[in-house]
Amino acid sequence: MGEKPDKYEILQDLMRRRGFAWGSFEIYGGSRGFYDYGPLGATIKRKIEQKIREAFQREGFFELETPDITPEKVFIASGHVEKFVDPLVECRKCGARFRADHIIEEALGMDVEGLSAEELTKLIREHDIRCPECGGELSDVWYFNLMFETKIGPYGDQKGYLRPETAQGIFVNFKRLNAFARNKLPFGVFQIGKAYRNEISPRQGMLRLREFTQAEAEIFFNPSETEHPHFDEVKNEKLRLYPIEHQLKNLGEIELTAEEAVKKGYIMNTFFAYYMVMVKRVLLDIGIPEDKIRFRQQLPEERAHYSRDTWDAEVHSERFGWVECVGIANRGDYDLSRHMRESGADLTVLIHYDEPKIVKRLEVSLNLKRVGPKLRKDAKRINELIKSWNEEKKRELVEILGKEGKITIEGYELEKDDFIIREVEEKITGEKIVPHVLEPSFGIDRPFYLLLENSLVIEEDRTYLKLKKDMAPIEVAVLPLVAKEPLKSIAYEIFRKLQKAGFIVVYDEKDTIGRRYLRYDEIGTPYCVTIDNQTPEDSTVTIRDRDTREQVRVSIEELPSKLRELIFGE
């Protein structure tokens, strides 16, 4: 028996040679972490984006488009300036830099997710981990912010960043989007666009890029209403889950229906489970095989700074193992609360009650006669600040005064008697809440690569992409049996007819018919239409199936409708 062919190398060659994708800036030696999509790759990428767009639109979500460049203050508010970092280490001999956690994991075979820079440095020293390039000594570990920094405007006085996610453009527009949704929760907003992360050492081809495409939806909902109204439609869908407890105990995956997963407490509620099913169905619709999809729950130390719980939809790769393609995160009220605090904007939603309620609330203000001499010109400002506090903060103040008898506000030490505190009853017809957010976040580039890998079929006499038919970059190839009249003219006329009918179609008369069939099989074209010597006699052609290689004869008149049925199921 011969050696098993290296599927990865075969696919890389096919992608470069046939116009799917290749490393950027080739004539200048390339730059890691950047990829160009060729004519066929760009078409498949667009089709993936469209599948996701249609799925979001079926849920009634609105589409938005916002700038890639964002002022620094947005990312200060979102926490990215402080927390969007990776641990970095440098070789003291050759100057090469690496992800510290990756180097340690490769050297020791252990998971170091969540360890501090000091703990990572200690592991490097204890195990004498050296530079993988030259064997030199490694520096201490420090943190490196992954955002690309830029200057906005000609004076360079306004710092900005290329966005590391599309989500923040949605959050900062919440006030307008809420008005557009007529103040009615839940509602979803999505954006498809570029994101940028200055990865320390991008590897694994298209799986870790510095510039990539995302399709993110932010679903705003009332945290007290977490039952999805349409959950019954998806409750019997099976999900392959790898929850936290199974990872910690090495128990492997489990398969449950969405309903069972919620009842057993693996998925927090039906709202979350509904969108996990939606994500699975999108991956299937793209053409990812069901047995290559699973959902892995992120461990607490893995989760992003904004996440309360995250499940990753992962797709299996023969070369790279399980690869995260979609993250489904409960972001809570993190983003809207942070932007409210930093911007001063009101990003709440008024929830109306069915019946008015009587509620008790605290009124807290300063005793201005008593504190006036102490606070002087600041008295009025601090009094207004305290009165603007929410109920939770006012009750916190009362609790501190009860325990300690004093509190410091804006640098002034104030005693219990400096305040006027009353509990009052009030009839209210609704309340303002900060909505919570559930976020399904699709990468586009990873599903693109994994779709090709999982579609690649290697046979003795041919290698071809067994793409889902409606995902093929070229849907139909029109081929005259030989490049002679009248076959050429008839074939070209059919080609133009199919173009006008909306198919992605090519005309090709070069090489033998057998070579042409293999050429279009290789790139995933599901059907070749052949114009042969019978065509001038009875106006029929053959349709050849890529997967079975079988051919059927149909009339030229019925050809568009037959192809539409075969490719799109219409």
Curated annotation (Swiss-Prot):
It is found in: Cytoplasm. It is an enzyme of class 6 (ligase). Its EC number is 6.1.1.14. Keywords: Aminoacyl-tRNA synthetase, ATP-binding, Cytoplasm, Ligase, Nucleotide-binding, Protein biosynthesis. GO terms for molecular function: ATP binding; glycine-tRNA ligase activity; protein dimerization activity. ATP binds at residues 197-199, 207-212, 324-325, 443-446. It comes from the Archaea. InterPro entries: aa-tRNA-synt_IIb, aa-tRNA-synth_II, aa-tRNA-synth_II/BPL/LPL, Anticodon-bd, Anticodon-bd_dom_sf, Gly-tRNA_synthase/POLG2, Gly_tRNA_ligase_arc, GlyRS-like_core. GO terms for cellular component: cytoplasm. CDD domains: GlyRS-like_core, GlyRS_anticodon. Pfam families: HGTP_anticodon, tRNA-synt_2b. It catalyses: tRNA(Gly) + glycine + ATP = glycyl-tRNA(Gly) + AMP + diphosphate. One of its GO terms (biological process) is glycyl-tRNA aminoacylation. The keyword Flavoprotein does not apply. Signal peptide: none annotated. Substrate binds at R99, E165, F212, T213, Q214, A215, E216, E439, P440, S441, F442, G443. Belongs to the class-II aminoacyl-tRNA synthetase family. Catalyzes the attachment of glycine to tRNA(Gly). This is Glycine--tRNA ligase.
